[in-house]
C-alpha cells in the first residue's frame, strides 16, 4: 500500500500551497487538533459509538451460535439484519436533516444505542432470556451508529478547514484504537459472552454520553 501511494498517487495540491512537514510537526499538529474541544468531544463520541460495533463483532458469534445455537446461515441473517439497520437509520438520519440539528440527531443515536445496551445488560443478568430480546438489543445498539457516526464526524470536522485531512486521520486512528481497546477489555472479563459484551458496551456508551454532554455545554457557552 505504501509503495502504491508513493509511486502512483500524485499530489494534486498546487506547489505553493504544499507543506514540508517532519514527524515532529505532524505530531504537534495532531496534538493541537486533539486539544481543540470542538473537535475532541464529537470525535470521542463518534469513536466510542463505533467501539460498540467492535464489541458486537468480537462477541456476536459466541453469543448467537454457541449460547443460542444458531447455525452459520442463521447467524449470517442476524448479522446482516444489523448491517441493514445501520443503512436504514443512516437514510432516516439524512431525511431528518431539515427537522433536527446535527447535535440533536447525534443525541437520538446515542439514546438508541443506550436503550440497546440496557436491553443487552438486562438480558445478561437474567436466565433463559429469549433470543428475540437479545436480537432487539443488538439491533438498537448497532443500528444507532447510523445516527451517531455521520453526525459525530460532521461536528468534529465542522471547524477544521485546511486541517480537515489531519483531523480525519486522527479520528480514524482513534476509532481503531477504540476497537483495539474493546477487544482487550473483552478478553479480560470473566463472565458470559453476553455479559462481557454488554459491560464493555455500557462503558463505551457512558463515555459517549459524557462527550455529548460536554459538547452540548460547549455549544451553550458559544451561544452566550
Put a short name on every predicted segment:
Residues 104-151:
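C-terminal transmembrane helical hairpin of 12-TM major facilitator-type secondary transporters
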Residues 1-15, 211-215:
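C-terminal membrane-cytosol helix-exit motif in multi-pass small-molecule transporters
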Residues 35-55, 139-143:
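Pair of pore-lining "gating" transmembrane helices in MFS-fold secondary transporters
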Residues 153-192, 201:
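A late C-terminal transmembrane helix in Major Facilitator Superfamily
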Residues 72-80, 169:
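Small-residue hotspots at the loop-to-helix junctions and early N-terminal turns
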Residues 58-74:
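Short amphipathic helix-loop junctions that connect adjacent transmembrane helices
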Residues 89-104:
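Helix-to-loop junctions at the C-terminal end of transmembrane segments
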Residues 10-43:
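Juxtamembrane intracellular "pre-TM" segments in multi-pass secondary transporters
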Amino acid at each position: 500500500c505504501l509503495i502504491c501511494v508513493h509511486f502512483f498517487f500524485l499530489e494534486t495540491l498546487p506547489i505553493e500551497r504544499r507543506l514540508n512537514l517532519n514527524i515532529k510537526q505532524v505530531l504537534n499538529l495532531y496534538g493541537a487538533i486533539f486539544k481543540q474541544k470542538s473537535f475532541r468531544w464529537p470525535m470521542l463520541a463518534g469513536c466510542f459509538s463505533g467501539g460498540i460495533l467492535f464489541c458486537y463483532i468480537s462477541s456476536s458469534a459466541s453469543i448467537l451460535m454457541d449460547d443460542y445455537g444458531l447455525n452459520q446461515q442463521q447467524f449470517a441473517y442476524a448479522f446482516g439484519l444489523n448491517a441493514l439497520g445501520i443503512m436504514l437509520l443512516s437514510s432516516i438520519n439524512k431525511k431528518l436533516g431539515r427537522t433536527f440539528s446535527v447535535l440533536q440527531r447525534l443525541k437520538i443515536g446515542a439514546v438508541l444505542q443506550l436503550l440497546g445496551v440496557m436491553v443487552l445488560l438486562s438480558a445478561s443478568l437474567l436466565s433463559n432470556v429469549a433470543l428475540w430480546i437479545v436480537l432487539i438489543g443488538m439491533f438498537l445498539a448497532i443500528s444507532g451508529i447510523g445516527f451517531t457516526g455521520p453526525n459525530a464526524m460532521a461536528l468534529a470536522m465542522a471547524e477544521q478547514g485546511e486541517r480537515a485531512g489531519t483531523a480525519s486521520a486522527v479520528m480514524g486512528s482513534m476509532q481503531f484504537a477504540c476497537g483495539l481497546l474493546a477487544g482487550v477489555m473483552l478478553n479480560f472479563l470473566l463472565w458470559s459472552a453476553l455479559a462481557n459484551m454488554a459491560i464493555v458496551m455500557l462503558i463505551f456508551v457512558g463515555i459517549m454520553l459524557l462527550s455529548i454532554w460536554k459538547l452540548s455545554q460547549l455549544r451553550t457557552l458559544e451561544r452566550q
